[in-house]
Amino acid sequence: MASSSLQSLFSLFCLALFSLPLIVSSIGINYGQVANNLPPPKNVIPLLKSVGATKVKLYDADPQALRAFAGSGFELTVALGNEYLAQMSDPIKAQGWVKENVQAYLPNTKIVAIVVGNEVLTSNQSALTAALFPAMQSIHGALVDCGLNKQIFVTTAHSLAILDVSYPPSATSFRRDLLGSLTPILDFHVKTGSPILINAYPFFAYEENPKHVSLDFVLFQPNQGFTDPGSNFHYDNMLFAQVDAVYHALDAVGISYKKVPIVVSETGWPSNGDPQEVGATCDNARKYNGNLIKMMMSKKMRTPIRPECDLTIFVFALFNENMKPGPTSERNYGLFNPDGTPVYSLGIKTSSTHSSGSGSSNSTGGSSSGGGGNTGGSSSGGGIYQPVTGNPSPDYMSISSAGGKGRFVECVLFFFLLCIIKLRL
């Protein structure tokens, strides 16, 4: 009898083990609409699947987009623009917004997050800064009233300009002049379990100091990297160093913030720019985004400071947006042209393992149609990094490639736990 029970348990163990993918893509894409030539949102899903995306971040709560993603399997993040913060401080208006723009589309459209404001604390607008935290509280309160606070989190996005310095990561802290506004937000993250969102662009760091910043280091290409003298952690790419700079800043504020997760809400590289925008080329954009997406597909998204945490990243952006103000680069961050053709080849292949409901393999980038969105930006500044030197650390390389092994160990432990319980019964 005991032998039969153990055989049944072993069968369940095998089923659980092989039904859990050891490598699971968690690729996010920013989907903006600051353009007058984009196709309708219903045509966007094939493009997102072609790059292996499973998460999509909007810059508004566009009804057409929310309807288009119904039943698609994609996890959606919606947003409240800075222009709405003052009125969303009113709990009644916040509740109306949540009911109309979030609850009305559930459960068919899988909305998982609301981003309240973008780079507000570094906007140098005191009225906007004052309205941010009350708006976050009101939106969260509205989710609580609707019984949605367990499935949808509330957060806001920051630029790296919230840091006083960003090199080396172990020396970073948050700007003192922002702590009064930032600390209540960090307490909110601790209380609600929501992540802090960071817009991180290694492109800006390279553009500002190309003589002293290694291009290979910022493009995820093979390089010597550098070892942080304060932590002895080795970094072979700038994005991870920027993320760990924020983790160091969180640790410096207080022990209660050590468990606040980070999401990279924007990162990308422009394929074109003005003459003075050093590094804004199609080849560099192809390398940055292609290498980044390949890393996400292979589950190597764990930084030295938080090797136990998988880092969620949203690439900016899905389309080139022809109506964005600013330098030429601002209109050239897209993976795709408005007609759905790829701006450049990412050199990746996707299958049903890496796409949201896609049943066939695709070679990117992209063959079908395009999409829409509203506002979005790549205005965040990257930290200035010094010349990178040093040798790659074998220990760090083993940390960052430790992707799916944890699931296997968990399954084994779970199986033996079941055996012990069964034998005792």
Swiss-Prot record:
Citing just one GO molecular function, the answer is: glucan endo-1,3-beta-D-glucosidase activity
| Any GO BP | defense response
Q: What does the record say about its membrane topology?
A: Lipid-anchor; GPI-anchor
Give the EC number(s) listed in the UniProt record: 3.2.1.39
- Chief location of this protein? membrane
The UniProt record lists lipidation (GPI-anchor amidated serine) at 401
Which stretches of sequence are listed as region Disordered?
347-387
Q: Which UniProt keywords apply?
A: Cell junction, Cell membrane, Cell wall biogenesis/degradation, Glycoprotein, Glycosidase, GPI-anchor, Hydrolase, Lipoprotein, Membrane, Plant defense, Signal
Q: Identify the enzyme class.
A: hydrolase
List, from the UniProt record, the residues annotated as the active site of this protein: 119, 266
Q: Where is the composition biased (Low complexity)?
A: 350-366
Which cysteines are disulphide-bonded? none
Residues carrying a glycan: 124, 362
Q: Using the record, list the residue span of the signal peptide; answer none if the entry has no such feature.
A: 1-26
Keyword Nucleotide-binding attributed: no
One cellular component term from this protein's GO annotations in UniProt: plasmodesma
| Compositionally biased intervals (Gly residues) | 367-384
What does the record say about tissue specificity? Answer: Highly expressed in flowers and siliques.
Q: Which reaction does it catalyse?
A: Hydrolysis of (1->3)-beta-D-glucosidic linkages in (1->3)-beta-D-glucans
What this chain does, per the record? Plasmodesmal-associated membrane beta-1,3-glucanase involved in plasmodesmal callose degradation and functions in the gating of plasmodesmata.
| Family to which this protein belongs | Belongs to the glycosyl hydrolase 17 family.
Protein name, as recorded: Glucan endo-1,3-beta-glucosidase 10
